[in-house]
Swiss-Prot record:
Forms dimers. Forms higher-order oligomers. Interacts with glycoprotein G (via N-terminus). Interacts with protein M2-1; this interaction directs the matrix protein localization to cytoplasmic inclusions comprising viral proteins L, N, P, and M2-1 and mediates the matrix protein association with the nucleocapsid. It comes from Ovine respiratory syncytial virus (strain WSU 83-1578) (ORSV). It is found in: Virion; Host cytoplasm; Host nucleus; Host cell membrane. Keywords: Host cell membrane, Host cytoplasm, Host membrane, Host nucleus, Host-virus interaction, Membrane, Viral matrix protein, Virion. The lineage of its organism: Viruses, Riboviria, Orthornavirae, Negarnaviricota, Haploviricotina. Pfam families: Matrix_Pneumo_C, Matrix_Pneumo_N. The keyword Membrane applies. One of its GO terms (cellular component) is viral envelope. This is Matrix protein.
Length: 256
């Protein structure tokens, strides 16, 4: 079994982002990715990861308003995992790899093949795209971060465009948009790192909360879902070998 610990925060209390790679115990086993809803923990990461791999996982495919879903049940007798959610539902389309199928409405035990724990900042220091978008009224433009990574094994560069937020810009300010992108955002990001969670997400540390980042606390972490950008890449390969080198910004008018 493989275990990975990504310490993006060194505080005594942190947000735990846990992801499992499991194999269904079946004659025709399905391969699944399971991510646990984030939870707060003050247990040392090294101790927590040891307990995370000693759990029993049951999976059942169900139908919901959001489409095919998986009902996850995690059983553990460890007091260390008392804060971890043990019953939750995730998207089957994201969880199952393209070659795997699960029987409908049948509860199946799974074997853990790998477990990843990422230590993020505490809950009030985390922000998502949805959090920012909800605070924008009558948006006129979108801010896209172009995050550049270098594959340290091949020296090839990959640019991942990620939607950050929508903003409202008055007509008289349109000419200064480019200047905003190169000044207010210049020192906004200190690093960006890919972590395994719900497939893959990008964690951006924000140091300057002016302009487009005014609703984000300084030194907080901004979480961006990468969606299908990296679906053909190995999670372990990407998290191990991709190094963030630069971030540029693009401000685009919202199309009708």
């Amino acid at each position: 079994m493989e275990t990975y610990v990504n310490k993006l925060h060194e505080g005594s209390t942190y947000t735990a982002a846990v992801q499992y790679n499991v194999l269904e115990k079946d004659d025709d086993p399905a391969s699944l990715t399971i991510w646990v809803p984030m939870f707060q923990s003050s247990i040392s990461a090294d101790l927590l990861i040891k307990e995370l791999i000693n759990v029993n996982i049951l999976v059942r495919q169900i139908s919901t308003l959001k489409g095919p879903s998986l009902k996850i049940m995690i059983n553990s007798r460890s007091a260390v995992l008392a804060q971890m959610p043990n019953k939750f539902t995730i998207s089957a389309n994201v969880s199952l790899d393209e070659r795997s199928k699960l029987a409908y409405d049948i509860t199946t035990p799974c074997e853990i093949k790998a477990c990843s724990l990422t230590c993020l900042k505490v809950k009030n220091m985390l922000t998502t795209v949805k959090d920012l978008t909800m605070k924008t009224f009558n948006p006129t433009h979108e801010i896209i971060a172009l995050c550049e990574f270098e594959n340290i094994m091949t020296s090839k560069k990959v640019v991942i465009p990620t939607f950050l937020r929508s903003i409202n810009v008055k007509a008289k300010d349109l000419d200064s948009l480019e200047n905003i992108a190169t000044t207010e955002f210049k020192n906004a990001i200190t690093n960006a790192k890919i972590i395994p969670y719900a497939g893959l997400v990008l964690v951006i540390t924000v140091t300057d909360n002016k302009g487009a980042f005014k609703y984000i606390k300084p030194q907080s972490q901004f979480i961006v879902d990468l969606g299908a950008y990296l679906e053909k890449e190995s999670i372990y390969y990407v998290t191990t070998n991709w190094k963030h080198t630069a971030t540029r910004f693009s401000i685009k008018p919202i199309e009708d």
